[in-house]
């Protein structure tokens, strides 16, 4: 087989294009909603408007799991691109401006009609845990025709978020992108995203891991949920023969990375005050993939992920503030 041509993009992500509205709330607010604390619940447009009215104005900032990852990776010097659908409305313009300003290539045409740009109500409780209610809006309009075959073939890593598996059209877009990437000999990375996403799509996710995924990102709850066990070691034993690398984050306990026949235990990077855990897993993936595409060893990749995650949980919002590259370089020198 002829090796693939050198890519001009390091990481291409497919994901939901979302603007987050972040609010600090007490646990009583979460208890009064039909949601799972710490998880993501899908809601409709009417519910989103009602929740916005209940919570009041919050801090608006661009989000979306895979989008957060490629923004973080771009800040670390990685050549990145993103595929996701917004509407040509105010929030769509905010999302487009923010992701391009971060240095991420974003060419998906906005929808001119249909649902508005996706919005996620992120409720941060005093323990810094985030609970999300997401109205997918225009994101559900993403389909196979939005996948640029040439761009996928020209990208070293195709990164997919599990959340995107919910809308059927987006699911088919992911399947098409996977076929193209595998045909070109590129790596496919998947983030399981959320334990409840795993519950919804366990059979499909198991099939993806069995047949298509090279790099798997998950937290311990997602990984154990995937294999229907409470035993993390058992889940690792199940996944290790199937993927090149599995990276499992464990909150304040750091991360465990298995690959190349080795297991790397990565300690959590001290974050000082933990303000908001939104985006921690996204930024771990960003740091890891930055190291991976730069040819770093797995331990260094994990350390880069841990440092990036620690930065993003030290402030409100799911995207890094300035200086991430210098911070990671200082903590994990080449």
Where are these regions (language model features)?
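Conserved beta-alpha-beta core of the PfkB/ribokinase-like small-molecule kinase fold
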Residues: 157-237, 253-255
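Glycine-rich phosphate/adenosyl-contacting loop at the front of the ribokinase-like
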Residues: 1-81, 93-94
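Alpha-helix C-terminal capping segments
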Residues: 70-79, 123-125, 291-294
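Conserved phosphate-binding/catalytic region of the ribokinase-like
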Residues: 1-12, 17-18, 31-37, 179-183, ...
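Hydrophobic beta-strand scaffold residues
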Residues: 80, 106, 188-189, 246
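A glycine-rich helix N-cap at a beta->alpha junction
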Residues: 98-115
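Conserved phosphate-binding/catalytic loop of the ribokinase/pfkB sugar-kinase fold
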Residues: 107-111, 122-168
